[in-house]
């Protein structure tokens, strides 16, 4: 792995720790997106290079004034190199994480071709999983998003 990627990953980890300290003090309300991406009956999960590094759904924070669908499209382009996909709203979740009060807008997209180009700075790994063979170390929002998204869209 190139030194520039390793240094940028380190920067992400340091920035995340600093944000956690700020969130501990301020307890902000944040809006974000999580995207359930499926292909051939499998679910795409990612491991970020920062934070808990558990298997997670791709997604991220919404920018101020950014509509949820636009945020989902932007995050998928940034993290996975995914361009145009038919996105469907799949519900909304509320909860607390890392001292924040989160509103998570859930979206779903089915890819015909399961090719993604992960950003090596932000993502340590990407992997496709069968719904019955999900890893045990899932980020805490994954199961609620799956529960919310799958019934709303007729399953995988």
Regions found by a protein language model. Name each.
Residues 83-92:
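A short coil-to-beta-strand element that immediately follows conserved catalytic motifs
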